[in-house]
């Protein structure tokens, strides 16, 4: 349904008529248009497609025609490029007016089916593979790739993770060595768990152009589909089934040196900045998934009877719902605040001040999703353990939880990173003020 739900926990407070300092008329108009579009083109079929394991190809084209892939880019949008391509608005919002609160609305609405796979099958590669080209790519590189990527004529993905290097980005071993004539990088290695990889024409790939450690990493646009030396295999995963998770083998792959993004050795810096956007949008999306899980269970508890009364009449059930609900609404307040701060800070300042907090938000969002999904499955009982019937959505959301806790930086790594970043920021501020260090 595209209407606003009255079920407790089903909607963010601002959509239930409660006052909010964050959203202006542009945001509210976009939310209505976004919900209507997504319901017709994605959400009402999401469970059917997830069960089938694939989203029809025309859906990606439908999103491109409506400019509905573009909200996945960091705000502010690349206005000059979009206008050059004849793109002036997204569902009525002028591209130059787009901010991170619009992005948050989009990410929230995209997850309203409760399933991350169908939406991720369309957006993940574009969302995280395209921004480095926009931000760091040379003029020639942008001219070569952006027209087709921004209009959806070609697809790309982000390829960082390897079989033996996930959150430890500095440990990747895929190499890119220059050919004797200096015209090509020869790429060898493997990438694993690459979302959307199987459908991608290109990947923004982390490669090792130098020695060990972070300083030896670079980013390279590597052709994938039907390209010599590239073999791709779709992986079977427990959740996010429609996401196109892919294993990529690279054997003597010749990539033009012009496909280098930025400078050799700057890969780690670019990857880390790119992670901020990825982690924020994940945090928003998983918070909506948590909403779907908890509100679905809430509705079920109002009608399901046990021991002569409804589940909702059982104090222990209300206690479970209250604990999960408190976590959920606290998390939403956290991400709304982050979205507002990102909207009102220059990008460089936001990266400096909010990188650690964004990592914390992504980790906490996944924890909240786990709490709400576990609660929902327990309250559904046997129905929550069944891949059909009234508990099938709660069951599917619980299988999505590892896909929230691991990608984009695993939970424990991000919690540690968040504090290290805050300590670093604190010491820099203290030094600037001339105070003693801790």
UniProtKB/Swiss-Prot annotation:
GO biological process: one example: fatty acid beta-oxidation using acyl-CoA dehydrogenase
Family matches, as InterPro entries: Acyl-CoA_dehydrogenase, Acyl-CoA_DH_CS, Acyl-CoA_Oxase/DH_mid-dom, Acyl-CoA_Oxase/DH_mid-dom_sf, AcylCo_DH-like_C, AcylCo_DH/oxidase_C, AcylCoA_DH/ox_N, AcylCoA_DH/ox_N_sf
Entry's Gene Ontology cellular component terms: cytoplasm; intracellular membrane-bounded organelle
Induction trigger: Expression is positively regulated by the aspyridones cluster specific transcription regulator apdR.
Keywords per UniProt: FAD, Flavoprotein, Oxidoreductase
PROSITE patterns: ACYL_COA_DH_1
Biochemical pathway: Secondary metabolite biosynthesis
UniProt superkingdom: Eukaryota
Cofactor(s) the protein needs: FAD
First-level EC class: oxidoreductase
Enzyme Commission no: 1.-.-.-
GO molecular function annotation: acyl-CoA dehydrogenase activity; flavin adenine dinucleotide binding
Family: Belongs to the acyl-CoA dehydrogenase family.
PANTHER family in UniProt: ACYL-COA DEHYDROGENASE APDG, MEDIUM-CHAIN SPECIFIC ACYL-COA DEHYDROGENASE, MITOCHONDRIAL-RELATED
Role played: Acyl-CoA dehydrogenase; part of the gene cluster that mediates the biosynthesis of aspyridones. The polyketide-amino acid backbone preaspyridone A is first assembled by the PKS-NRPS hybrid apdA. The assembly of preaspyridone A is initiated by loading of malonyl-CoA onto apdA, followed by decarboxylation to yield the acetyl starter unit. The growing polyketide chain then elongates into a tetraketide. The adpA PKS module catalyzes three Claisen condensations, as well as beta-keto processing and methylation.
Protein's name according to its UniProt entry: Acyl-CoA dehydrogenase apdG
Native source species: Emericella nidulans (strain FGSC A4 / ATCC 38163 / CBS 112.46 / NRRL 194 / M139)
């Amino acid at each position: 349904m595209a209407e606003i739900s009255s079920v407790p926990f089903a909607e963010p407070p601002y959509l239930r008529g409660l006052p909010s300092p964050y959203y202006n008329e542009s945001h509210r108009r976009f939310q209505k248009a976004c919900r209507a579009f997504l319901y017709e083109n994605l959400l009402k079929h999401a469970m059917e497609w997830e069960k089938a394991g694939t989203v029809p190809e025309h859906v990606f084209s439908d999103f491109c025609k409506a400019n509905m892939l573009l909200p996945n880019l960091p705000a502010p949008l690349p206005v000059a490029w979009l206008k050059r391509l004849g793109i002036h608005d997204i569902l009525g919002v002028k591209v130059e007016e787009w901010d991170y609160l619009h992005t948050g609305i989009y990410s929230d609405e995209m997850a309203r089916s409760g399933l991350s796979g169908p939406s991720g099958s369309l957006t993940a590669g574009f969302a995280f593979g395209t921004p480095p080209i926009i931000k760091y790519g040379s003029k020639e590189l942008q001219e070569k790739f952006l027209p087709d990527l921004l209009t959806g004529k070609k697809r790309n993905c982000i390829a960082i993770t390897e079989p033996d290097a996930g959150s430890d980005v500095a440990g990747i071993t895929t190499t890119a060595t220059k050919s004797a004539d200096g015209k090509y990088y020869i790429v060898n290695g493997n990438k694993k768990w690459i979302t959307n990889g199987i459908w991608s024409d290109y990947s923004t790939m982390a490669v090792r152009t130098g020695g060990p450690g972070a300083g030896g990493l670079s980013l390279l646009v590597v052709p994938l589909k039907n390209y010599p030396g590239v073999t791709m295999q779709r992986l079977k995963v427990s959740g996010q089934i429609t996401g196109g998770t892919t294993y990529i083998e690279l054997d003597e792959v010749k990539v033009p040196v012009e496909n280098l993004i930025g400078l050799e050795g700057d890969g780690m810096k670019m990857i880390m900045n790119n992670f901020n956007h990825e982690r924020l949008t994940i945090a928003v999306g998983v918070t909506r998934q948590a909403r779907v899980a908890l509100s679905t269970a809430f509705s079920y508890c109002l009608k399901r009877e046990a021991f002569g009364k409804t589940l909702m009449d059982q104090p222990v059930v209300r206690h479970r719902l209250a604990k999960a609900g408190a976590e959920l609404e606290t998390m939403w307040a956290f991400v709304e605040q982050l979205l507002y701060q990102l909207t009102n800070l220059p990008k460089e300042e936001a990266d400096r001040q909010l990188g650690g907090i964004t990592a914390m938000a992504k980790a906490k969002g996944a924890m909240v999703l786990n709490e709400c999904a576990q609660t929902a499955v327990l309250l559904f009982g046997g129905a929550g353990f069944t891949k059909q019937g009234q508990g099938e959505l709660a069951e599917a959301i619980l299988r999505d939880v590892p896909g929230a806790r691991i990608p984009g930086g695993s939970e424990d790594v991000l919690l540690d990173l968040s504090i290290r970043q805050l300590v670093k920021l604190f010491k820099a501020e203290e030094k600037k003020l001339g105070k003693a260090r801790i």
